[in-house]
Amino acid sequence: MRNQTKMMLVACLMAVSTPMAALAAAQDYAFEAIKAEVRNGPGGDIAVRLVHKPSGKPVEGAVIFRTRLDMSPENMEGMTTKVEPLTESEPGVYKFRADFTMAGGWALKLQAKVQGEPETVQGAVVFTAKD
């Protein structure tokens, strides 16, 4: 009977500890552009996919709490524009609307919380605004 109790205790400990070991780290996630080119001008829609890199699967339900869109790819980090979040259109795809005021490279910098991940997931995606 004692062996059976010990085995049950070990099984319970394994079941409780396995999810903790399975947690990914913030660097196991990446934001990717759905389409890297966008129309220069007002009301440009952009979309990014949040991916869990080890599995390659999209991550849905992330809470994106900070965004910044600037022209840092063109060495003009001070040139920014407002970013308006839109609704999640498909699992793991996050859409935004912005006014692209100049043709060239724009970096969308994001910070997000992913369920079960204690660290903040951060990333940047480069878009090219074309006339």
Residue map of PLM features:
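Contiguous segments within soluble domain cores/interaction surfaces
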Residues: 24-103, 107-131
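Bacterial N-terminal signal peptides that target proteins for export
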Residues: 1-9
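Bacterial N-terminal signal peptides
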Residues: 9-19
